């Protein structure tokens, strides 16, 4: 039996880690400590999981005490993004393994701190990049490894975050770069890690454009531009807000599924934080639209775009190689898509042969059954039958962050950003 402690009692910590640990891995692990900056989160956690009523609680400045009392074998870091680095580094100083939610940290400077701490530690860092585990994404990796498309030359990845999911980031702490690193870090690092992993190459340089088009005070959808600092729960013009109306349909029977934004007043779950801030606030300092080009050290090129206010959620993917091409389109969450859409497949186009359509079987669980497989690898060890590495470590986390930070810096500085330059610049 191994001991696990949590730094950060977020909704993600509950759904992705605590619930599965209690239901599927309780014969292997025991949760022996809970740490959070907000005392109310302990009550929320223990109400949701009564079995944890006896587990000691620790404030954010009591990390060392928790390590002495709870004696963890693994520290799971799942709080606000900017808090990750301190707990990861401290855990490594205690020679303890770390599982961290993505993004690993929010800046390349902090990524350097993690890499340096890991090099001196007996512990290691694992980043919970669950997109790698999607059955479609694993199949694409296998096709590339099998040489189906030869040497990869370019990737086109267009990602669409819909008005439900996209708006949620601008209601919450994610809308501040100091907390999230911006959405090029908080969200796009998922996508960059996926491409980095598919290619088996490291990014060298990124050039990007970006803008705030849908949210913030200048949005054409803002129903009351002259008033700042509103909250959905008390807003006097919320019935005129298209984003609010999509999440709060007039029919009480209507149900929209989203794991980032919950209907109803959530303020009682926190001490001094409201996750229903106005998406048109002046304080928003991040972008909601990006277009970027990334060059890799193995010769591959990535063309990437993402918007955070699309009519539907999903992606369009093309991977070109010297011997063929892979295409796949995903439409995410049927309850949020207002039209009929096809099942996802993988289209394989050999360079001089006929097209092949590949069906992929989805399993139970999030991300097409990918989440349960990630959890098995995290808590039961790597699958001995899998012929390729899939768990992400600190270096993978660092490269994904470097592309994300390089992207927003390129937007701000209007120039290409080299990864080597970025790591050296931030190595202070």
Swiss-Prot record:
Q: What is the lineage of its organism?
A: Bacteria, Bacillati, Bacillota, Bacilli, Bacillales
Any idea of its EC number?
A: 1.-.-.-
User: What highest taxon heads this organism's lineage?
Assistant: Bacteria
Arranged from A to Z, the UniProt key words for this protein are: Oxidoreductase, Signal
Q: Name one GO molecular function term.
A: oxidoreductase activity
Q: Which gene encodes it?
A: yteT
What is this protein's expression induced by?
Answer: Up-regulated by growth on type I rhamnogalacturonan.
Record's protein name: Putative oxidoreductase YteT
The residue range of the signal peptide is 1-23
This chain's function reads: May play a role in the degradation of type I rhamnogalacturonan derived from plant cell walls.
Q: What class of enzyme is it?
A: oxidoreductase
Q: Which Pfam families match?
A: GFO_IDH_MocA (PF01408), GFO_IDH_MocA_C (PF02894)
The UniProt entry's sequence similarity note says: Belongs to the Gfo/Idh/MocA family.
């Amino acid at each position: 039996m191994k001991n696990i402690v949590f730094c950060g009692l977020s909704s993600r910590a509950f759904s992705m880690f605590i619930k599965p640990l209690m239901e599927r891995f309780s014969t292997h692990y025991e949760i022996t400590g809970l740490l959070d900056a907000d005392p109310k989160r302990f009550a929320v956690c223990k109400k949701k999981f009564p079995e944890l009523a006896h587990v000691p609680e620790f404030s954010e400045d009591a990390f060392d005490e928790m390590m002495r009392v709870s004696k963890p074998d693994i520290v799971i870091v799942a709080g606000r993004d900017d808090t990750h680095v301190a707990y990861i580094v401290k855990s490594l100083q205690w020679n303890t393994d770390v599982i961290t939610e993505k993004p690993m940290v929010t800046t390349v400077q902090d990524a350097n701190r993690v890499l340096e701490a890991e090099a001196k530690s007996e512990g290691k860092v694992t980043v919970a990049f669950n997109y790698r585990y999607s059955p479609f994404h694993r199949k694409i990796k296998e096709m590339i490894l099998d040489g189906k498309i030869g040497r990869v030359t370019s990737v086109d990845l267009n990602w669409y975050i819909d008005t439900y999911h996209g708006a949620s980031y601008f209601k919450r702490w994610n809308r501040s770069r100091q907390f999230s690193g911006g959405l090029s870090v908080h969200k796009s690092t998922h996508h960059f890690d996926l491409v980095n992993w598919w290619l088996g190459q490291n990014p060298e340089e990124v050039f990007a454009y970006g803008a705030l088009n849908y949210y913030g005070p200048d949005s054409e959808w803002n129903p009351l531009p002259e008033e700042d600092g509103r909250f959905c729960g008390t807003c006097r013009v919320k019935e005129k807000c298209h984003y609010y109306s999509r999440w709060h349909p007039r029919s009480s029977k209507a149900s929209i599924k989203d794991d980032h934004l919950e209907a109803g007043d959530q303020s009682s779950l926190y001490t001094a934080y409201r996750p229903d801030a106005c998406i048109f606030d002046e304080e928003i300092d991040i972008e909601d639209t990006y277009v970027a080009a990334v060059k890799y050290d193995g010769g591959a090129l990535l063309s990437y775009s993402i918007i955070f206010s699309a009519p539907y959620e999903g992606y369009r993917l093309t991977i070109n190689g010297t011997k063929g091409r892979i295409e796949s389109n995903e439409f995410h969450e049927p309850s949020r898509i207002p039209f009929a859409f096809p099942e996802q497949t993988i289209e394989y186009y050999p360079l001089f042969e006929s097209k092949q359509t590949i069906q992929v079987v989805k399993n139970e669980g999030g991300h097409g059954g990918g989440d349960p497989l990630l959890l098995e690898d995290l808590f039961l060890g790597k699958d001995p039958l899998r012929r390729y590495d899939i768990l992400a470590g600190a270096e993978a986390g660092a490269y994904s962050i470097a592309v994300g930070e390089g992207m927003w810096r390129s937007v701000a500085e209007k120039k290409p950003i080299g990864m080597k330059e970025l790591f050296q610049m931030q190595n202070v």
